Curated annotation (Swiss-Prot):
PANTHER family: XAA-PRO AMINOPEPTIDASE 1. It is an enzyme of class 3 (hydrolase). This is Probable Xaa-Pro aminopeptidase P. One of its GO terms (molecular function) is metal ion binding. Keywords: Aminopeptidase, Hydrolase, Manganese, Metal-binding, Metalloprotease, Protease. Mn(2+) 2 binds at D408, D419, E531. Pfam families: Creatinase_N (PF01321), Creatinase_N_2 (PF16189), Peptidase_M24 (PF00557), Peptidase_M24_C (PF16188). Mn(2+) 1 binds at D419, E517, E531. It catalyses: Release of any N-terminal amino acid, including proline, that is linked to proline, even from a dipeptide or tripeptide. One of its GO terms (biological process) is proteolysis. It comes from Penicillium rubens (strain ATCC 28089 / DSM 1075 / NRRL 1951 / Wisconsin 54-1255) (Penicillium chrysogenum). Binds 2 manganese ions per subunit. Its cofactor is Mn(2+).
Length: 613
């Protein structure tokens, strides 16, 4: 995870910038579908900067370079950026945003360039307006300059086959989903919807792919109108089964033809006059796609109705999430029992990658296994403080049994997606480690036990996860929760729990699946995080003020919480009962996996025993 010398790459990029008459060049993290996680061929920001985190923006002027990222990645970026780069710590008071840094560098009528397919239309407009006030301009550079620097070394675009996601896991046919989308478009008087987000297309058509590691999606676009459904994907990626699945209901078109077709739709709309219905475009769609559709005057940009529908799981999907978390919980239990035995009893020397590999091996034995949902974060001691740490063979640490061990991992199963973090100490934790862990646990329980009226946002309940840390002057620099897909992306919008303004926009609704993951981190020492997946459900309350609908959470993660890190005296009676009830539930739902595995069964029995003050 060390720094890469980027001097030559930056030199070549600056030569290209001068050729294209660009003074500042922006390199976003995202691909042309604004994906958070990307295929290797789209890792442009990582290539040019050396920083491999999933979030961040690189900005290069003719004399400087800066990388902006959020609190999850401050430590990682500090280690991976060489001395050509300035780290902009997002959200830290007094540190400029990447937009502010760009504006400052572009003073005096300079041109700022960006690949228009890698930035949202709304983001481009806001930046252009800011630059205009400064006498500068934003220029769309269609030929990606980083790709030119990368050259033949750039990985090829994936060409794996697309496959059908059966109704027995999806819970609805794609025809039903398209019909519901059309009703919404009709109610909004829209001519159609152009879809660019990969997980939305996969969900809508009940299809899955492997184009992006850990995310079962495939490169595609789609256009839905009142009478037609078109999907833009390379024909050689479609198996006979997929073609039969789509049948006569969907027209398949070449992936690259979306922009020409979008221009044709724009021309047709303009010829129909001012009163013609507009096309709907997601507010996360690219500037390039928006321009092809005629820009702001020809389209309405809004939150995607498909994203909203996808986030509210049906009963089949919810049951799948329950089932896959029981299997996954059993796999994690087997792993932690194995790891403790190897470290403590056998005195085996294991590094962090050894641990991650063993966990994947155990998971792969379970029914409906379809791969991991992200790189396993297997971290010992100080590496646990690197929130999105990625261990690599040869440079990772040996797991220290006398230090805290944090493991954040997830899996894709055909019936659901998992994401679980557990923190263990296989030796004797310090009093402060126990105190910090218990404060984090109280936050986890606070979210889990929350009851709130319909219409409440994730922003509003975030304090329940942080309040106990705040009382002692502690905090964590990441969100408390993110949406989770159903055999889809492990990070799914539009809902979440956290301090970001975006979490005020969409209220939590019954059927949402969200992570509950407060943490605490001490740089250079340790990291603590406890992550469960919870499902928002309607709950019955003793009273019903205002005739409101009330919601609460049902946890589905079935993995024990490290008992020797819990300080029972810090827990209320209700919290203590929650821990004991939770561990009893885990035992009841997973012990049958280990009736012929005495090692794991004994570990599970020990870790799920009641605790008391």
């Amino acid at each position: 995870m060390g720094a890469v010398d980027t001097s030559e790459r930056l030199s070549k990029l600056r030569q290209l910038m001068q050729q294209h008459k660009v003074d500042v060049y922006i390199v976003p993290s995202e691909d042309s579908h604004q994906s958070e996680y990307i295929a290797p061929c789209d890792a442009r920001r990582e290539f040019i900067s050396g920083f491999s985190g999933s979030a961040g923006t690189a900005i290069i002027s003719l004399s400087k370079a800066a990388l902006s990222t959020d609190g999850r990645y401050f430590n990682q970026a500090a280690k991976q950026l060489d001395n050509n780069w300035q780290l902009l710590k997002g959200g830290v008071e007094g540190v400029p945003t990447w937009q502010e840094w760009t504006t400052e560098e572009a003073q005096g009528g300079k041109a700022v360039g960006v690949d228009p397919s890698l930035i949202t239309a709304s983001g481009a407009r806001k930046l252009a307006e800011t630059l205009k006030k400064n006498g500068s301009s934003l220029v769309g550079v269609r030929e990606n300059l980083v790709d030119l620097v990368w050259g033949k070394e750039r990985p090829a675009r994936p060409s794996e086959k697309v496959r059908v996601h059966p109704e027995k896991y999806a819970g609805k046919t794609f025809q039903e989903k398209v019909a519901e989308l059309r009703k919404e478009l009709e109610s909004k008087k829209k001519a159609g919807f152009v879809i660019s987000m990969l997980d939305e297309i996969a969900w809508l058509f009940n299809l899955r792919g492997t184009d992006i590691p850990y995310n079962p999606v495939f490169f595609s676009y789609a256009v839905i109108t009142p009478t037609t459904a078109e999907i833009y994907v390379e024909d050689d990626k479609l198996t006979p089964e997929v073609k039969a699945h789509l049948g006569q209901d969907v027209v398949v078109k070449p992936y690259e033809s979306i922009f020409a077709d979008a221009q044709a739709l724009s021309t047709k709309s303009q010829s129909a006059g001012e009163n013609a219905a507009k096309f709907l475009l997601s507010n996360k769609a690219s500037w390039a796609l928006s321009l092809s559709l005629g820009g702001e005057g020809q389209v309405e940009e809004a939150r995607s109705p498909v994203a909203d529908a996808k986030a509210i799981k049906n009963e089949t999907e919810l049951e799948g999430m329950r089932a896959c978390h029981i299997r996954d919980g059993a796999a994690l239990t087997e792993y932690f029992a194995w790891l403790e035995n190897e470290l403590i009893n056998k005195k085996t020397v294991l590094d962090e990658v050894d641990g991650a590999d063993k966990l994947e091996q155990i998971r792969s034995k379970h029914d409906l296994f379809a791969g991991l949902s992200f790189d396993t974060i297997s971290s010992t001691g100080p590496n646990g403080a690197v929130i999105h740490y990625k261990p690599e063979k040869g440079s990772c640490a040996i797991i220290d049994p006398s230090a805290i061990y944090l493991c954040d991992s997830g899996c894709q199963y055909f019936d659901g997606t998992t994401d679980t973090t557990r923190t263990f100490h296989f030796g004797v934790p310090t009093e402060f480690e126990k105190r910090a862990f218990t404060l984090v646990l109280k936050g986890t329980i606070g979210i889990d036990m929350a009851v709130f009226p319909k219409g409440t946002s994730g922003f509003a309940i975030d304090v329940l996860a942080r309040q106990h840390l705040w009382r002692e002057g502690l905090d964590f620099l990441h969100g408390t929760g993110h949406g989770v897909g159903s055999y889809l992306n492990v990070h799914e919008g539009p809902i979440g729990i956290g301090t970001r303004v975006q979490y005020t926009e969409v209220p939590i609704a019954a059927g949402n699946v969200i992570s509950d993951e407060p943490g605490y981190y001490e740089d250079g020492k340790f990291g603590i995080r406890i992550e469960n997946i919870v499902m928002a459900r309607e709950v019955k309350t003793a009273h019903n003020f205002g005739d409101k609908q009330w919601l609460g959470f049902e946890h589905v993660t079935m993995t024990p919480i490290g008992r020797n890190l819990i300080e029972p005296s810090l827990l209320s009676d209700a919290e203590l009962k929650w821990v004991n009830d939770y561990h009893a539930e885990i035992w009841a739902k997973t012990e049958h996996f280990f009736r012929e595995d005495n090692l794991t069964r004994s570990w599970l029995e020990r870790e799920t025993q009641p605790i008391s003050k």
